[in-house]
Amino acid sequence: ISKGLELGSRSNSQVGNGTPLSRSTATSNFTHFRLNTNYTVSPFKDFIFMLNAGGQYTLNDLLNSEQTGITGEQRLSGFTSGAISGDEAWYVRGQVNKQYRLSKNFSVSPYVYTAGGTAYLNQPTAAERTATSAKSIGLGLEVTGNDEYFFDKSISAKVEFSKNWATGNIENTSSVRLNREHLLVTMAMRF
């Protein structure tokens, strides 16, 4: 639960000719409820099923900083992170991994996923949509390893290819070069 207070914040009446608020009908007095959850289970040896779901509910028109998105690495990863957001939203993502341990410190895990969600604006302007729905499917490969020689670090990498669909032209602006397809490459090193 998040509650906005009007202490020290600007309102639309105080903007004047200065910098406008991020949403013309939003105020700093708001309440929204957000829930994000995940569930992981291994139904068979070396298979992992992951389910991520969540959303946000509000009766208010929110400033951009309080809106929630349905895109991201554990959500609809086939779209640019932050490309689809709204005052209210829901998303769900299911993923199945098959893990191959190549050594004690190195594993490779191909996976397939599907995801969908919708973001809503409570009081859209003439240039905005009331709702933007999206879905994506894809496959990827995760590589994880541990290096015990220098600083005892964990190294992980991911390559994912996705096919996307969305209302309006969101998929066109998110994926200009790949024709509604998205390639995600990440690498992380944890000490």
Model-identified regions with their sequence ranges:
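Hard-cation-handling environments
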Residues: 1-16
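C-terminal transmembrane beta-barrel domains of outer membrane proteins
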Residues: 19-191
